[in-house]
Design a protein with these regions (language model features):
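Acidic-leaning, charged glycine-interspersed low-complexity segments
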Residues: 23, 91-139
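Short, low-complexity, polar/charged sequence segments that are solvent-exposed and flexible
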Residues: 49-52, 64-69, 89-92
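Oligomerization/assembly interface segments of phage tail-like spikes and tubes
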Residues: 61-77, 125-137
Length: 139
């Protein structure tokens, strides 16, 4: 069984080593969505997991369906940068299988890109989200 924690850690590690992404967002600002540090530096990326579902309804299932949201935050007057970074993330990972940290991402399917919008908790920033559905197994 693959855990959500393993999948999230694999995504974070992979994003941190993807030059097209880290050219716009410092690797130290790529973290799990639940991170509760005291400093929130922009731009940043947070990795949020959705459902982890077995592809076969039995205890011997080796492939799972995983939902992941890559959330891009910026603090600027315009939403343009958030949308640009979201596009870079989508391009870097859509249909590009990878292995990281003991997890093999057999298929990485882009399900949507949410255009930048102002999050309800911070009127000075923008949030754009890239949503993927993946097939994963142990590497």
């Amino acid at each position: 069984m693959i855990s959500n924690a393993d999948i999230q850690a694999a995504w974070i590690a992979k994003i941190k080593t993807t030059p097209t992404v880290t050219a716009r967002v410092p690797a130290v600002e790529v973290r799990e969505d639940q991170w509760k540090g005291e400093r929130f530096t922009y731009p940043n990326i947070r990795v949020k997991l959705g459902l982890l579902t077995p592809t076969q309804p039995n205890s011997v299932c080796l492939v799972f369906r995983s939902e992941v949201a890559i959330r891009v935050y910026v603090e600027q007057k315009s939403s343009k940068t958030a949308d640009e970074i979201a596009g870079i993330v989508a391009t870097a990972f859509w249909s590009h299988p990878f292995s990281q940290g003991g997890v093999k991402f057999i298929a990485v399917n882009l399900t949507s890109i949410e255009p930048a919008d102002v999050p309800e908790w911070d009127e000075n920033s923008w949030l754009s989200t890239v949503n993927f559905t993946c097939l994963v197994s142990a590497a």
